């Protein structure tokens, strides 16, 4: 997979650029990895993901949420939590759009916040269940 990183310092921040490079390489074994966090930060517009050719080239989707009330330019991996109603990135909306457009692949949670890392097993199971239930309703 090729994963565009939406950070301003990233040399590859756009899924569109990644897909163009994959196409021009002629190597059919590559897919783009869409990360809801990096898609929110990067230059790609939601309309980009309405193209069946794009959807067919997505290999995996990483999902996380950001509940923090900070400037978008200050978002960091440490702010990534399990997606829920307070997610300012609206990751569930992007997931629902991808599925409406035909994505049938896998999702992978990527919450890096210390809040999630410090959860006990029972608390984490409940938090994951709540997040999955929230995402299923999108």
What is each model feature region?
Residues 1-10, 117:
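Active-site-proximal beta-alpha loop/turn segments in soluble metabolic enzymes
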């Amino acid at each position: 997979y090729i994963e565009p990183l939406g950070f301003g310092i990233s040399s590859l921040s756009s899924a569109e650029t990644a897909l163009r490079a994959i196409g021009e390489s002629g190597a059919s074994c590559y897919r783009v990895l869409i990360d809801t966090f990096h898609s929110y930060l990067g230059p790609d517009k939601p309309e980009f993901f309405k193209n069946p050719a794009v959807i067919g080239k997505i290999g995996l989707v990483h999902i996380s949420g950001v509940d923090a009330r900070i400037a978008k330019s200050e978002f960091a991996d440490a702010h990534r939590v399990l997606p829920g109603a307070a997610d300012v990135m609206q990751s569930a909306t992007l997931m629902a759009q991808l599925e409406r457009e035909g994505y049938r692949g896998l999702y992978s949670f990527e919450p890096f916040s210390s809040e999630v890392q410090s959860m006990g097993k029972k608390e984490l199971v409940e938090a994951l269940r709540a997040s999955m239930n929230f995402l299923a309703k999108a």
